[in-house]
């Protein structure tokens, strides 16, 4: 079986594949203070809960945007799953034309998402990954990764408001029924969610124009489903986009993986 791991700024998401079937997934917080044993035992507990032997894992592929946790994660995988993990973009060819001015600057997760989305949804395409940061990625009609935009995540923006404005409270992120808030909390929620939807709409519209026409818009990330309820330009929501991209990269590089 294949274990695909998406290491994000807030969470690590683990997906266990049996062939092309996602057998199960789980997430834990991204914490650079954990030891490799702590991390390894969390992974082993998940396997035990689902009555899966750690020895059944034959390959591990990782996409990460958090370098400080990689040493610990790699050691945990080696010790508890007995596998040498492969890092997407470093050890395995991601398999998409990258038109960034400096291709090394692009986060591996963004390219992995592109591989997955093009396979599933076609092209041209805009991928909106809504998490700690929100990224917009443009795939042209030839399937090439053209670049995109990076925007602060909604939770990050709300936390900054709480920290910098002494009289404003920390609030849950939800959209009140009315644009005109009748309390401070409602006003903050209205401004945050409606303002964020406005930003999504504006950036997607501008990217559509630069791509030269209508491109399908796919949302993913921790807040992708919530924002899709409010943003009419989002066509699809795919929470497993990155995991599925990692699986595809494994399949495309299977021979190299098996010869490691």
Language-model features: where?
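Glycine-rich phosphate-binding loop of actin/hexokinase-like ATP-binding domains
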Residues: 27, 31, 123-159, 235-242, ...
């Amino acid at each position: 079986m294949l274990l695909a791991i998406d290491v994000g700024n807030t969470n690590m998401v683990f997906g266990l594949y049996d062939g092309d079937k996602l057998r199960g997934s789980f997430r834990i917080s991204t914490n650079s203070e954990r030891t490799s044993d702590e991390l390894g035992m969390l992974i082993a507990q998940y396997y035990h809960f689902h009555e899966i032997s750690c020895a059944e894992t034959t390959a591990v592929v990782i996409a990460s945007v958090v370098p400080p946790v990689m040493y610990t994660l790699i050691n945990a995988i080696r010790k508890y799953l007995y596998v040498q993990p492969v890092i997407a973009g470093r050890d395995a060819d991601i398999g998409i034309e990258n038109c960034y001015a400096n291709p090394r600057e692009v986060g591996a997760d963004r390219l992995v998402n592109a591989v997955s989305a093009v396979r599933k949804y076609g092209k041209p395409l805009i991928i909106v990954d809504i998490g700690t940061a929100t990224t917009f990625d443009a795939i042209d009609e030839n399937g090439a990764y053209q670049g995109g935009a990076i925007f602060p995540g909604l939770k990050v923006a709300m936390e900054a408001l709480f920290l910098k404005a002494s009289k404003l409270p920390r609030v849950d992120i939800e959209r009140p029924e009315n644009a005109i808030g009748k309390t401070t909390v409602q006003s903050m929620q209205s401004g945050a969610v409606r303002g964020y939807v406005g930003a999504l709409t504006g950036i997607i519209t501008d990217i559509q124009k630069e791509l030269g026409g209508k491109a399908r818009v796919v949302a993913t990330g921790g807040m992708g489903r919530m924002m899709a309820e409010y943003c009419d330009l989002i066509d699809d929501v795919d929470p497993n986009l990155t995991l599925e991209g990692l699986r595809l990269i494994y399949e495309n590089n299977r021979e190299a993986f098996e010869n490691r």
